[in-house]
Amino acid sequence: MNNKSTIIKNDKNLVFIMAGLMVGLLVAALDNSIIGTAMPRIISNLQGMEYYVWPFTSYMLSSTIAIILFGKLSDIYGRKNILILGIVIFVIGSIMCGFSTNMIELILFRGIQGIGGGILIALPFIVVGEIFSPRDRGKYMGILASVFGVSSVLGPILGGIITDTVGWRWIFFVNVPIGIIAIGMLMNSLPDLKLGGVKKVIDYSGIITFTLALSGFFLGLTLAQDLNAYPLVEIIGLFIFSAIMFVLFIWAEKKAVEPILPLYLFKNSTFTISSIENFLATALIFSGIIYVPLFAQGVLGMSATNSGLIMIPMLISLTISANIAGQIISRTGKYKKLAIAEFLITGAGVILLATMNADTSPYELLAYSTILGLGSGIMYTVFTISVQNAFSNREIGITTAAMQFFRNVGATVAIPIFGYIMNYSMSSSAAVNLSQKEILTLSIQNIFMATIILAFAGLIIAFFLKETSLNDDEQINEEIIGELSDKAK
């Protein structure tokens, strides 16, 4: 049958499109993992252990805001233009990070880098949702998700090796050639996809209130990690400010002609449940990405390189499970059981990680983190596909961006909360005359104990996910077909 999805699926140019999307995604995804193993050395060089989580937080905050904003702007100005812009911003931010002379500069420059990273994380999944039928999306979502696994494998290794050899600054400079390659591939392969019928109206009120609401909230969370360093009244003030901006944001979205985040989406139970599950699942995987290397170096005494190597099995398992989940969805058209399996497996992983102590062997740490990765990979395909299937093609852009948004929110909220748990645990443990290694061990144990609660909540919620069979065919944007066909000639 010569239907629309078959025309797209057989287009030879799709090979180059997927390659370009994967490299673009790689340049952002690599940065999430490469900095983890380098952070102890960065802190040692620039000073400021109290700022340990801030480079993560600033990056995640700016990328979280960028996902929604530029996901919507790509409806107006085209996916290709926004993708290229994202790479340029990311590369510039990387260069600035590499030249940082203190932690404050690094935190600020990571924020710039995060804007580009947010664009590059969201747009590839939107494009795949547009050019493939629901049944085929599983395979290609799995392929894109594997980029996170590959980058996560390469990231810790590169982060450790680069840090131990030429220095931590080069973990940022390495993004420059990758970014240039990504621009070249996307310029020559990706058509300028635009959503027809969208009014060229920018929701400035929504953008401003959205940015201020998130910034106030996340800044308050971050400052709350150390109540001794920051006045409580300032922290409370930030949360109040955030709440006011959030109310104004809701009001602005109700009035907007083209809202950046349409509120009616939340009336769909699949969208709401998938958003919550993305939030929880991302918090779980980030607990491993951040604190497994710290445990390996600080408790087990491993080098930056070896702490990166011990992360490889976890991230390979993430890649494998993402692809397997995508294949299962493509063949069966079902995804609910996979959502349940996601939290059963990740729950087992964090329970085991919570048992770690100074006597834990590197092989045990490797096994525990691998289980966490095996469950986490399922997230990248299941919840994006469930939401794309619950809405029309016209809404794929914003709904897909929203799923990436809630993943980033999960990480951005979890990172400072984990930091608060660590700081509180370290200060409490210091009062009972424990050694530094014992204090660090107990602090990391407490973090993983907290993630057990998140895994249990995710498991319960997964049972309420509505499952709708995926179709083999779907009406695909005629403009997309035309552009792909022209490029294939």
Language-model segments: residues:
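Intrinsic disorder in cytosolic terminal tails and internal cytosolic loops
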Residues: M1-N13, L465-K489
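C-terminal membrane-cytosol helix-exit motif in multi-pass small-molecule transporters
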Residues: V176-L195, T211-L223, F241-A256, G458-K466
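Central cavity-lining transmembrane alpha-helices of secondary-active solute carriers
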Residues: T57-K72, I121-F125, I312-A325
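12-transmembrane solute porter fold
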Residues: F16-V27, G36-T37, P55-F56, P231-F241, ...
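Interfacial helix-cap and linker-helix signal at transmembrane-aqueous boundaries
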Residues: I42-I43, L73-S74, L106, L158-V166, ...
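Helix-loop-helix hairpins in multi-pass membrane proteins, especially solute transporters
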Residues: F70-S205, N393, I415
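Extracellular/periplasmic helix-loop-helix junction of adjacent transmembrane segments
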Residues: A38-A66, I107, T305-N306
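Cytosolic juxtamembrane N-terminal segment immediately preceding the first transmembrane helix
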Residues: M1-L30, S44, D75, A256
